[in-house]
Swiss-Prot record:
Organism lineage: Bacteria, Bacillati, Bacillota, Clostridia, Thermoanaerobacterales
Record's protein name: UPF0309 protein TTE0306
HAMAP family given in the database record: UPF0309
Family annotation (NCBIfam families): PRK02947.1
Originating organism: Caldanaerobacter subterraneus subsp. tengcongensis (strain DSM 15242 / JCM 11007 / NBRC 100824 / MB4) (Thermoanaerobacter tengcongensis)
SIS domain mapped to chain residues: 31-212
Any single biological process term in GO: carbohydrate derivative metabolic process
Similarity annotation: Belongs to the UPF0309 family.
Membrane-crossing segments per the record: none
Length: 246
């Protein structure tokens, strides 16, 4: 099973490479263009385990400082797993959450949801567009073919977003299956691995774009190397008013 899981990761990443590069480049271009202003940021939002995607890009060694992670306590697993599942299906919670953050017209938000079907992530895309933001969705497009939306509009996340990146993950997330007698067990999810790969590809392309435009990418250094503290403090000072969770 160890080998099978690794093989599935390789296979899915190869599919991302062969089918999603243009979408990732489009998203990177859109985000780069939104970062022209001195204190512009882009935002990342996800519910449940997908919130780890926001954490992956936020305050990260080797990552951009201009990333605002939207991490509301209502949707965090460590604040109550059952509560987070309840609110993930609740579209009304989104306006209350987004009102806590400074989301400027013309900025970009990445919304991460493996299924793309629940009320909160779909409403997040709708609300963000209402506020004038550009929406990039990171989701598995397989779900729309196999199930229904839980949002009152009947829409999936991919129906609302400006750019849709398919993480090429499976329906149900779990990728390995064992059948024994009358029992069928599916296990070993992929979405966190695939989302992390895609988001770091996206960020690498954003940084490349910034360099090509003679912009200075505000990249954090690892706090465990010499000289990093002074460098990072300058970036923190620059963006601290925009990043709620610093």
């Amino acid at each position: 099973m160890l080998d099978l899981y690794i093989e599935e990761i390789y296979k899915r990443i190869e599919k991302i490479k062969s089918t999603q590069l243009e979408k990732i480049k489009q998203a990177a271009h859109l985000i780069t263009e939104s970062l022209i202003s001195e204190d512009s940021v882009f935002h990342v939002f996800g519910c449940g385990h997908s919130h780890m995607a926001a954490e992956e890009l936020f305050y990260r060694a080797g990552g951009l400082a201009c990333v605002n992670a939207i991490l509301p306590s209502e949707l965090m697993l460590h604040e109550g797993a059952l509560k987070s599942s309840y609110y993930e299906r609740n579209e009304e919670i989104i306006k209350l959450i987004f009102d806590r953050y400074e989301l400027r017209k013309g900025e970009c938000i990445i919304i991460v949801s493996h299924s793309g079907r629940n009320g909160a992530p779909v409403e997040a895309a709708i609300d963000a567009k209402r506020r004038g933001l550009h929406v990039v969705a990171l989701t598995s497009t397989e779900y729309k073919q196999k199930t229904f939306s839980r949002h009152s509009s009947g829409k999936f996340l991919e129906d609302v977003a400006d750019i849709v990146i398919d993480n090429c993950g499976p329906y149900g997330d779990a990728v390995l299956t064992v059948e024994k007698e009358d029992i069928k067990i599916s296990f070993s999810p992929l979405s966190t691995v695939l989302n992390t790969v895609i988001l770091n590809m996206l960020e690498a392309e954003i940084i490349t774009n910034m360099l090509e435009k003679n912009m200075s990418p505000p990249v954090f250094l690892s706090g465990n190397i010499e000289g990093a503290e002074e460098h990072n403090l300058k970036l923190i000072e620059k963006y601290k008013k925009r990043l709620r969770h610093l």
